[in-house]
Amino acid sequence: MKRLSKILLVFLMVLGLTACSGGSKENEPAKIEMGKENKFDDLVSYKIETISRPQQITPDVIGSFYTYYKPSKSTNVLIDVTMYMTNLQKKEMKLSSTLKGTFVIDKTDYVASTAMVSEDGKTISQGGSLAAEGTNKVHFYAEVKPSLLKNNIEFKLTTVDEENPKEANMSFKLTDIAKNYESKNLNDKIVLDGRGEIALQAVNITKKLEPANPVGLYTYYQVQNDGNSFVVLTTSIKNISESDITASNIAVAKLVDKDSNEYPANSFYEKDDRSNLASASTTVLTPGQSGMIHFVFEVSDAVANGEKSVRITYNGKVFIVNL
């Protein structure tokens, strides 16, 4: 009986230790996956769209005047994680009091600022709030020395909750991120299910953008600096949805140079008879309608004539157009 009692006691001790170990795993950070829905239960769901090093954090639709955020030191750069985030609560959620983003590089923490893009893509503001059960594009970004971005980077997203904080994280090298995007070439077509089709037609480098067949008074655009050029990606965009869509809201385009620097696009609609240009942000495509849209990037001559690509995104889908 003594022998049996000892065996039973040891068995119970092992069982107790096993149960304790299993409980600790519940507090381990979740892994963030690109291209998939991630979630903090009953709080938010989010899907990472891009990870990049932009020169500025800008609205999706570039107008004549807009707010942007850039490094405080001209020698620094930004690291930016962009995601579509949905508030799972039935009440408004203030980002700054709910979530905290942090980049960890060489064991040093860089706390991320947040910027939210408006629903129409025309404005961007720091912080911001998600409407009850609403969805917005959100940037988590930090200012760092450019040399640091060659290293392995960890991004952590943490809930602001003193009693029961939750964390999700991912590790990556910036040079490997493009492997998650779908590659396209000129003459290919990008299909955004239920929204639009983008036929990639041509790329031109010019100092002046004007319609093909101007008549009378017409609109044209010139570079602001003699040392700059326009890189113009010409597309035909078709609205395949069942409602009107502003042409500038079909997708977002950014030019990426050989050093991974990014440049936002101005987009213009060229009339069907090619007689004039108009801003894509004032052009509405009805269901089934197609239009010629130019994505225009003003960059230095060196960037215009160097190795480059265009990244086109919409709602978590990302395409790299090889030029």
What are these regions (language model features)?
Residues 20-80, 84-323:
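Conserved functional micro-motifs across diverse proteins
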Residues 1-25:
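Sec-dependent N-terminal signal peptides of Gram-positive bacterial secreted proteins and lipoproteins
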